[in-house]
Amino acid sequence: MQVDKEILRALNQVLGQALIAINQYFLHARIAKNWALSELNEKLYHQSIHEMKWADDLIERILMLDGLPNLQELGKILIGENVAEILRCDLQLEYQKTDIIKNAIALCEQQRDFVSRKLLVKLKDGSEEHIDWLETQIELVTSMGIENYTQSLLDS
């Protein structure tokens, strides 16, 4: 199935964001595990796996459209050096990723590619859910203080 090159470029941009997220969340999960923050480790590890599944869906869609998935275009990974920074870095990534997804959705609507649009809406919804979780965690850090927040995440 042939499709507009702009759609393929947009899908590859979203794929690039998913690849960044896989690596960033995985590294942050392992940092949290090293700090004995099992709850944060588990959440970020599962988010990394979700991103991997979304990347797989994007790869399949790009291939279906006779495109070539670009797995080499990795952007900058934002690594936090403490819990608050980890949350802020992940939130920044999600904001950036969501903006790129929204632009891709608009392009799909313009080009009448509703199958790609449906996939992208699913990814956007997942990103917005994660944004809500991250914003809540940052609010908890602010209201509880970083020490109490971190203590609440420690292994029992």
Task: Please identify what each model-predicted range represents.
Residues M1-S156:
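Iron-associated oxidoreductase/ferritin-like identity signal
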